[in-house]
Amino acid sequence: MEAEVDKLELMFQKAESDLDYIQYRLEYEIKTNHPDSASEKNPVTLLKELSVIKSRYQTLYARFKPVAVEQKESKSRICATVKKTMNMIQKLQKQTDLELSPLTKEEKTAAEQFKFHMPDL
């Protein structure tokens, strides 16, 4: 029984040695065939880091999803309020026969920016 254990132990040592040699050869070939990428990280390490980054992203997404929903609802409420205000102003203008002076350059720019950010209007 002890001889079989020793034999298995030697097999594992040889396998470990073979893996070390394969790793050494791969690193050597990468360095010689692609010297400019020799400073790059090991792909396995990059995958582990990617996994950590993905986990962080999911955490951030979970934290900020309610904020995004609330922001969207706020934007909708603001748009509704602006629409009501614009309608009231138009009604008042019609009732009083009041004409507005043309918009200044700054006012036109502000109106364009507002329409860009609030396309629902």
Swiss-Prot record:
GO cellular component: cytosol; kinetochore; meiotic spindle; outer kinetochore; SKA complex; spindle microtubule
GO biological process, one term: cell division
Molecular functions per Gene Ontology: microtubule binding
One Pfam short name: SKA2
Family membership: Belongs to the SKA2 family.
Biological role: Component of the SKA1 complex, a microtubule-binding subcomplex of the outer kinetochore that is essential for proper chromosome segregation. Required for timely anaphase onset during mitosis, when chromosomes undergo bipolar attachment on spindle microtubules leading to silencing of the spindle checkpoint. The SKA1 complex is a direct component of the kinetochore-microtubule interface and directly associates with microtubules as oligomeric assemblies. The complex facilitates the processive movement of microspheres along a microtubule in a depolymerization-coupled manner.
The name this protein goes by in its record: Spindle and kinetochore-associated protein 2
Organism from which the protein derives: Homo sapiens (Human)
Gene that encodes the chain: SKA2
